[in-house]
Structures are given as structure tokens and as C-alpha cells.
Amino acid sequence: LKDYLINFLTRPFLLDTNVLQLLSKKNKIVSVHSRRAEKVLFEMLVTYGIKNVIFHWYSGPLSLIPKIVEHGYYFSINEKMTKTNSGIEIIKRIPRNLILTETDAPFNKVCSISNTLTDIGLGENAIYDNFSRLISAIRR
């Protein structure tokens, strides 16, 4: 069973190395859902020099957030994150200039962007500026 689990857990990453190699040569925005693979995925992104990354609905360890931030990666948050203790702790550690919003519709039944902004005390203009900065990075 142990060998099976190791194969099962590592197989998706072996496939993704081809995608990462391709992305390393492109200047694209990459949105990643890193659930239960945050550290491994982060290390792979850094190893392949992938830039312009958005960590979608990040739920990983708080200790990894400073490293993600150091690489200038963004985080997309939604209203549901603002309603849980773990989500609030994550949001507190993200610099405001690296926050984007998302609804995660239709999976997240609570999906109000305006409520998300109100809950974290961030205005639409700040999100617009963050997104504009990300877009301008791929236009260079």
C-alpha cells in the first residue's frame, strides 16, 4: 500500500514537469490549486523559474506564505476564506499588493466579491491595481 501511495502522489507531478518546462519558456499567468501539495508545487515552480503565479484559494501551511510572497506570487481569495479561522490567518499574512479576488463559482455557494473586499478591508481599486500589475508583467 505504501508504494502505491507514493506512486499515486508523485505521478501527477511527473506529468506536470512537461507543462512546467513549457511554461518556463512562456510569459503567461498561471493559476494553481495547490491543496495538499503546496510545498512540492512551490518548489517546482521555483525550480522551473515560473513567474506570474496565482495561488488559488490557498489553504496550505502558514510557514510557506513568506516564501511564496518572496517570489512575488499572488493569492486569490474568496468570501468563504474570510469566514473561517484558517482562511483569516492566511489572509492576514498576505501583503495587500499580492491579493486578487475570485468567486470559485459554482463550487463555492458563497461567492460575493464585494463581501470579500469588505471582509478584508480592501477596496476595488487595490484589486484592480494588483491585477493590472500582473497583466503588465506578461505584456513586457
Model-derived regions, located:
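Short acidic/histidine-rich active-site segments
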Residues: 97-111
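Conserved, mostly hydrophobic/aromatic
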Residues: 68, 91, 104, 131
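Short amphipathic alpha-helices and their capping/turn segments at secondary-structure boundaries
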Residues: 86-96
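Short glycine-enriched, charge-decorated loop/helix-capping segments at active-site entrances
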Residues: 5-10, 113-120
